[in-house]
């Protein structure tokens, strides 16, 4: 999924 939207994978 979007890694930019989440600080952690």
Curated annotation (Swiss-Prot):
Keyword terms, alphabetized: Amidation, Neuropeptide, Secreted
Tissues in which the protein is found: Limited to neuronal cell bodies, neuronal processes and sinus gland.
Phenylalanine amide carried by residues: 9
Taxonomic superkingdom: Eukaryota
GO biological process, one term: neuropeptide signaling pathway
GO cellular component term of the entry, any: extracellular region
Major localization class: secreted
Protein biosynthesis is among the record's keywords: no
Subcellular location: Secreted
Family in the record: Belongs to the NPY family.
Function: May act as a neurotransmitter, neuromodulator or neurohormone.
Entry protein name: Peptide tyrosine phenylalanine 4
Source organism of this protein record: Penaeus monodon
Top-level taxonomy: Eukaryota, Metazoa, Ecdysozoa, Arthropoda, Crustacea
